[in-house]
Amino acid sequence: MKKTKVINSDLSRVIATMGHFDKLSIGDAGMPVPSSTEKIDLAVDNGIPSFMQVLNNVLEELEVQRIYLAEEIKVQNPKMLTAIKKRLPDTPITFIPHEEMKKDLADCKAFVRTGEMTPYSNILLESGVTF
């Protein structure tokens, strides 16, 4: 059995294949995902698992050099924005319109669906390098 934090086989596989500048998205239960993007559906109930639980888990194994958030999170979900900034205090943030984020999902290695039920709880993680 795998000993590291990410034990979901699909999620672990995607993280293992990430290269520099590749993107992985984590999002709420309502985010529409293009059919061309792999969807790893972890949602089992409202709020389970939460966005932050999944983000924290992924960050145990993925080197992130930049994050992308919807501009709308600033007004519509400031608590989540604060939590993300606290978890990634030194990571540059680029804010983009939510509609642009939805389009950008087509360029992600995968989208990880959580059970999160709060607005604009979506993030694009840009992979960095560990050297």
Swiss-Prot record:
One of its GO terms (cellular component) is cytosol. This is D-ribose pyranase. Belongs to the RbsD / FucU family. RbsD subfamily. One of its GO terms (molecular function) is D-ribose pyranase activity. It is an enzyme of class 5 (isomerase). It comes from the Bacteria. It catalyses: beta-D-ribopyranose = beta-D-ribofuranose. Substrate binds at D28, H98, Y120, S121, N122. Its EC number is 5.4.99.62. Disulfide bonds: none annotated. The active site is at H20. The lineage of its organism: Bacteria, Bacillati, Bacillota, Bacilli, Lactobacillales. Its main location: cytoplasm. Keywords: Carbohydrate metabolism, Cytoplasm, Isomerase. The keyword Isomerase applies. It is found in: Cytoplasm. Pathway: Carbohydrate metabolism; D-ribose degradation; D-ribose 5-phosphate from beta-D-ribopyranose: step 1/2. It comes from Lactiplantibacillus plantarum (strain ATCC BAA-793 / NCIMB 8826 / WCFS1) (Lactobacillus plantarum).
